[in-house]
């Protein structure tokens, strides 16, 4: 069955809106959690790395949040995608639509949370005597689209495989924690010894974080990093959709697809 783009967009909006309402139902702070949660983590890491370990990085608060906020978008999307099909089982059983929209809606929801953190970045830029750049106007959409593609590729793989391998959740949690420390979020990439430089070279998440940091802190677009983000994102999406389509017959028997 073929679907037009208008229908898919409307469907994406409806599912994303539903997920937002479910998440913040009976929550006193509501959408403020989208800012409070990453900001709290930033305060903890600032205390540990700047005040205790005395990491010598200029404007460390801005440095930290420009890496941590985009990371939260990716990590939350990847983690929540594990149960995205299971959480939407009732909709899947009752409605005919492309099931791949479900993990995409989760990525978009976390992307909206990320957008809510950009004003926080702006405030800290002014606090440290820095200002937003005009390049943000086209730079934010450019990098954000790349991150959507990349994160969707990861999410469709996780959400599909988790229906068959429930232990995947534990491997994903460990993997995300490992990648967090292998990605220059808390530290600068030039602090890594040369013999370990491959950690940055072969880590597409590093390209993602450094793309955002260059834009927010310097007002520049690093097209090398952005190209890596898009390239790996497209590959992951193609692989993810291939896995999804190959397992669709099995998913149909489980009423999940």
Question: Over which residues does each language-model region extend?
Answer:
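Hydrophobic transmembrane alpha-helices and immediately adjacent juxtamembrane helices
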Residues: 1-257
């Amino acid at each position: 069955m073929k679907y037009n783009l208008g229908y898919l967009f409307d469907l994406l909006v409806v599912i994303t809106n539903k997920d937002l309402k479910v998440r913040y139902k009976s929550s006193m702070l509501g959408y403020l959690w989208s800012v409070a949660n990453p900001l709290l983590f930033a305060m903890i890491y600032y205390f540990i790395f700047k005040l205790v370990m005395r990491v010598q990085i200029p404007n460390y608060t801005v440095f930290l949040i420009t890496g941590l906020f985009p990371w939260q978008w990716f990590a939350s999307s990847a983690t929540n995608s594990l149960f995205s099909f299971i959480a939407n089982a009732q909709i899947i059983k009752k409605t005919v639509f492309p099931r791949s929209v479900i993990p995409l809606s989760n990525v978009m929801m976390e992307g909206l949370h990320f957008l809510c953190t950009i004003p926080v970045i702006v405030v800290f830029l002014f606090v440290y005597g820095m200002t937003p750049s005009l390049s943000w106007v086209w730079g934010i959409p450019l990098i954000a689209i790349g991150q959507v593609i990349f994160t969707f590729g990861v999410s469709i793989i996780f959400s599909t495989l988790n229906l068959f391998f429930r232990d995947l959740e534990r491997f994903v949690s460990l993997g995300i924690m490992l990648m967090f420390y292998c990605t220059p979020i808390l530290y600068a990439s030039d602090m890594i010894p040369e013999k370990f430089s491959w950690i940055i070279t072969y880590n597409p998440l590093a390209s993602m974080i450094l793309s955002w940091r260059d834009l927010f802190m310097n007002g520049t677009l690093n097209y090398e990093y952005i190209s890596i983000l898009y390239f790996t994102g497209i590959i992951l999406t193609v692989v993810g959709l291939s896995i999804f389509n190959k397992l669709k017959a099995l998913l149909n028997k489980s009423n999940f697809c």
